[in-house]
A protein has these predicted regions:
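ATP-binding pocket architecture of kinase catalytic cores
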Residues: 41-66, 71-149
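Juxta-kinase regulatory segment immediately upstream of eukaryotic protein kinase catalytic domains
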Residues: 1-21, 68, 72
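ATP-dependent phospho-/nucleotidyl transfer catalytic cores
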Residues: 14, 21-25, 46-49, 55-59, ...
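A short linear-motif detector with a strong N-terminal bias
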Residues: 1-2, 10-13, 24-28, 88-93
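Short alpha-helix boundary/capping motifs
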Residues: 35, 75, 168-169
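ATP-binding glycine-rich phosphate-binding loop
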Residues: 13-38
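A generic alpha-helix structural signal
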Residues: 8, 69, 134, 185-188
Length: 188
């Protein structure tokens, strides 16, 4: 595990690291929950190491995240949303004011305030959960539809290019490098 205390000092957390632990069930980034003592009050944060194998250029990714989250928060405040800070992620700046920090090994880290009483799901189990996910996605689209400035940086080339993704799938099925096609024939 990474030295979470050392990494936490890279961010403007305005307190002292107490402890941290691996958090959640995600499989892309390394996610940790950390506790910070702020004048006698313990506050939780999410600390994430961006996966450099997936995101080859993490700094433009973080610039995208900052633009989108700042804009969504601005829109929620304009709508006088009483829970604006619960409805969008908010990046905690690094000690040098950036939306990320690089550790001595070159790993890119980010910190968000922990959103208490929030829930995440790895799998949808009910129709209501599916409806809520669709509603949340629609709300996000509405909040970011008027995002000003240049287009966002393409963090994973062709990720949203359906033609390219289908071609890659067909190639993987054809070559079947791990011999798994026969096990998933029904899905194909």
């Amino acid at each position: 595990m990474h030295d979470l205390k050392a990494v936490s000092t890279l961010f403007d957390l305005r307190g002292d690291f107490v402890h941290g632990y691996s958090y959640g069930s995600g499989h892309i980034n390394d996610t940790y929950c950390i506790w910070v003592d702020q004048a006698g009050q313990r506050i939780r944060y999410i600390l994430q190491r961006v996966n450099h194998n997936v995101f080859k250029q993490p700094i433009p990714l973080m610039e995208n995240v900052k633009r989108v989250t700042d804009h969504a928060l601005k829109r929620l405040k304009e709508e006088q949303c009483p829970e604006a800070y619960r409805r969008t992620l908010t990046l905690v700046p690094s000690v040098d004011g950036k939306p990320y920090a690089l550790d001595s090994d070159g790993n890119c880290w980010r910190v968000y305030p922990f959103i208490e009483r929030a829930r995440t799901y790895d799998q949808i189990e009910t129709t209501k959960q599916c409806q809520e996910a669709a509603r949340a996605f629609g709300e996000f689209q509405k909040l970011t539809a008027d995002l000003p400035g240049e287009p966002l940086f393409e963090t994973i080339p062709n990720f949203h290019n359906t033609t390219s993704r289908l071609a890659a799938l067909k190639e993987a099925i054809q070559s079947d490098p791990l011999g798994r096609v026969k096990e998933v024939q029904k899905e194909i």
